[in-house]
Amino acid sequence: MSTATTLTVLWVVPVPDFGGVARHVLDVARTGIPGYRLVVCAPEGKLTERLRELNIPVHAVPFGPSRGFRTSFASLTHVIEQEKPAIVHSHLAYADVIAAAAVNSLKMRRLANRSLTVPTLITTEHGIAGDDAVYHGTSWRSKLMEQVHRVRLWGTNAAIAVSRSTAEQMRRKWGARRVSIIYNGVDAPRLRAAVHKHCVPTEPDAPRILSLSRLSPEKGIDVLIEAFAQLHTVYPKAHLEIAGEGDLADTLAQQARELHISDAVTFSGFVDPLEAMGRSDMVVQLSLWENCSYTLLDAKAAGLKTVATNVGGNPEILAPNELVNRRQNAFCDSVLEALMRNCEASAPSAWTWVTNAEMTAQIAELYTQTQKHQGLA
């Protein structure tokens, strides 16, 4: 469709580097939003570099937590005035707050200047947890942010949740209304082919287990190491790859040494996830909370076996026999049972999910319906 007949949507992202949200932005940029011209406002970094490679218009401006409220607000306001988007779509809490402030400031200014155009404001929630400590650490901070989100949602026209669980938490904690569920998409055939390029043949009775996450307490990697140590007594050729970086790297390596499994455990640091999946049979994710995990989506799309905690959006992705209860006393035993079950099982059954094209079509439909509701379409 010609850009002359499309509306501009400005995506606002406060992070410069790769992560779950950057992956989402790139998937949408690569696929396109039907009927809309995508422009991205973000701090300079790897994300903006990749977007330029995709020929996506980018405003790399001083924006994000490190720049502070005043600078971020001024930067975003300038971009909005320059682009005059029909829609401003924010991602992650910092961008949500700044975007709400900027758009609602324009509403106030429009009272004195009716020629000003005020964009529709939409937000996608990627990271709200049932346990407030996961993202906010202290109770006072979580209570403060709860009130901030309640206020900014009053001035937001529509909200997207990446899972049913996410939507439930938004309604329960923030009193959110007009929440639409649009799952993160994954193009399974393309991803499976990409992983297959890195495929390393396995040996009999030599299961290869992969963890792809930050090395931090909420990820439960210590429990995985403990369970793997017991699995290793049954499968002496088993191997565990712990990919990722974080504060617990030394502690987890010491745990592996104390359990006498150092030779069977590799701490590979930051890796290409597709390459890591190519040399693995099973992905394990024991997080305290997940909303719509790209790691699990990719693992399922690649045809790998999976084990994950029964939290957040995980039950919306995985079957019951792939889930373990993190809150029970025998958590490690449950993980071991799931690992053993996967080692003894045949290849996973067929799995289907929302494609990127379906995801972006749903986003476009929400844009159009929200515009109509406001009398703008």
What positions do the PLM features span?
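N-terminal strand-loop element at the rim of the active site
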Residues: 11-71, 181
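A conserved mid-protein helix/loop that constitutes part of the nucleotide-sugar donor-binding site
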Residues: 19-27, 207-233, 247-253
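Helix-loop-beta element that forms the nucleotide-linked donor phosphate-binding surface
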Residues: 52-56, 167-186
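Short His-centered aromatic/hydrophobic patch
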Residues: 90-98, 125
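Membrane-proximal helix-turn-helix segments that form the acceptor-binding/catalytic region
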Residues: 141-159
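Active-site donor-binding acidic/aromatic loop of nucleotide-activated sugar
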Residues: 248-251, 261-271, 276
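Aromatic "clamp/platform" in nucleotide-sugar-dependent glycosyltransferases that forms part
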Residues: 288
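Conserved acidic donor-binding segment of nucleotide-sugar-dependent glycosyltransferases
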Residues: 320-330, 337-342
